[in-house]
């Protein structure tokens, strides 16, 4: 065999070997509700690191841009690419039935992450990796109620109304308030998870002359916005208590600086990594310990904030 022939044979062998390796990789389509969300950005980054560390897992991320129909189209496109599994962070938790139906029809395992479908009954081949959002609301409100000595007036910054995370966190807050009849809710308004909206809404309340003892926010970003509005209005730290949820780096820093009174840690890494583990197991037709995997929340206070950094 001449040199050229030997080289061609070697190249072919390498190509076949490379092809075999690629064929062994699991392709997982990841449909995110939106890339432009602080908490979900951290979760997406953790998922990428997890897949890289595992090896043999190829993640294909798509951005739903907070559009239900766009996300459904993206899921269909991922199915058309014959991914081995799907991970979906739904735009609208009430609109997951079509996604579930499409995945089941294609025989592709599906894992919902961070936001669970409104229907708690998951069919075979479908799992969820989320947290108990009612617990988040209970934790932040119980802490605030004690700080307020069981009396005062609160306002609530709501996340997107299309998410059961918003409804459940708020319900958790209201469950606690049943034990504290002297704490009243003055206002509730949708801030759609955004810092700027949290700031604008709080500023409007202050401009209207609303008097409140605490701001209870469904997430850290809106809570930070509220704290900024309070500062601009000349309020001293501690005059109005502010509570968030997520424990993002910005949220942790805000607790450390006293801008936030309290937050609740939602484990982005745990949710992201857990969803990949579940998707890989389902793709390999391995059994999961449970279909609905729950990652616990943890209270973040000025006393323990450094343990979360």
Predicted regions located by residue number:
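A residue-level marker of the well-folded mature domains of exported/periplasmic proteins
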Residues: 6, 22-309
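Gram-negative bacterial Sec-dependent N-terminal signal peptides
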Residues: 1-23
